[in-house]
Amino acid sequence: MAELTLKTAKNTYKLLENSIYDIEKNTDINMSILNAVDALPYNKQTKVLKNILETSTTLCFINLDILSAYRQYLSAQTNYEERYAMKSLNTIMSEGYKKVFGFTQNSKSFWKIHMKSVVNDYPELLADYERITNSLEILALNCVFNKDMRDFSVHYDIDPRKVYSMLSQLSAEEVSDRFTSFFACITDVFVFIRKTIDIVVTPFLSTKI
């Protein structure tokens, strides 16, 4: 872990621990609210609420996974532990981005499907939505997700040479840079979702629950 000083690594390790605790609490709150909404009669409005809350909870899981994997990287004691954490980070970023924004399957993108439908009904959210959409598109261009690494990490390969080569060529600096860019963007999405909850979900629930 030559890219990080020991002091910086320790400070970051502790900060990530605090962030994980906070996100765990948000996840529990989201699930409590989602369960309450599930108990309401199904209609267009409750469907919108579920979409927002499900999106928010999925983001919590992505954040928890990526922060835990980076924390694992910071605490690694062996070369392979570092490499295992790095390939886990890459897989989480690839799968997280696919779930948030999609690569080619837009029907599976909650940003383009769930959140776009909300923005259509709440124009005050449009400017932030378009700004973040642009950031997500740039992220895919500038923060290249390594598909081969993802595939080898999840499925291995019939040829162990390919897996060994992938592990040997892993760059901690490159993966850390990707993590920084990805986390900044996904945090922006998370803040937008929290704003959406304040505007859409909270006022509705205050009259129903």
Each model region followed by its residue ranges:
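Histidine-centered, metal-coordinating catalytic motifs and their short helical/loop contexts
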Residues: 136-165
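Amphipathic alpha-helical interface segments
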Residues: 1-142, 168-209
